[in-house]
UniProtKB/Swiss-Prot annotation:
Reactions this protein catalyses: L-lysyl-[protein] + 3 S-adenosyl-L-methionine = N(6),N(6),N(6)-trimethyl-L-lysyl-[protein] + 3 S-adenosyl-L-homocysteine + 3 H(+)
Recorded GO MF terms: protein-lysine N-methyltransferase activity
Listed name of the protein: Ribosomal protein L11 methyltransferase
Keyword Cytoplasm among record annotations: yes
Keyword terms, alphabetized: Cytoplasm, Methyltransferase, S-adenosyl-L-methionine, Transferase
TM ranges: none
HAMAP family registered for this protein in UniProt: Methyltr_PrmA (MF_00735)
Amino acid sequence: MQWMEIKIVFDAAEPELAQEMVSYLVMEHGAEGLEMTTPGETGMVQDGSGSSVPDSKEHSVTAFLPLDDLFEGRKADLTRALDDLKGSVLTDYSVHFSKQDDQPWETAWKAHFHPIEIGESLVIKPSWEDYENPEKRMLIELDPGMAFGTGTHPTTAVCLEMIETECLKKAPERFLDVGTGSGILMIGAYKLGARKVFGCDNDMDALEAAAKNLKGNQVHEGDFGLWLGDLLAGIVEGAFDMVAANITAEANVMLIPGLPRIMAPGSIFIASGIMAEKKDLVLEALDACRFSVERVQETGGWVGIAARMP
């Protein structure tokens, strides 16, 4: 398969925030093999974090879209999304296109995916690296491949930290991750004491990667379940006492009205993947469904929200 390399070069008053938001947008529009550069350094990883080497003279985000029947639509949607950031997050930007084969970048991101500690008790590490663990943290070991997050993006870190906080109060009997991707939130919840963990995603490749990662992290087959579908479509089992969704603000707004059908009374919902300027959209949707907001956490321009069902 051929791929289109898309390089977005930009100027911004807050370049780190802009870089995170642009990288998140391109991943949301189906991009893979993400690379981010900053003047004086560069770092290549799946979701924008990791080590760096002296190299770049510009702020940029480079990613790859498959040259398939969906390419033109994705390209147009991404252009509109970038235009929405201009004037607020971005002062200016340009986009450059180049056809590429996938082999040169298929595994290059691995060199920059290193262990990262999350919260008080978790650490995410790649399967190919060793990790000294004097604090006896619970290990989440991933080999996510190109298409799924390594867990180092701020939205994932915020979500895992909030899951940890709630699990320390009371670990759930039944945990659900909406848009599970690599399965990292399911694994984290299980390590933190959840008895049964479930996940849904609209991408079969994601579900296959999640199943592999769950088994690789000693989550017993009888303790997890995976569904294919958008948001809550296809989920017939209810009474979850913790639900997490690390998706966009707009997707969270669409998700929230359906939550009372599948959540137990008094259960907790954790929403992440929310740009700070869009948090009110999610807060309003929660209020309309009578959720009580218990915590709002912001990191690097991204927001996580914990809210309780009535």
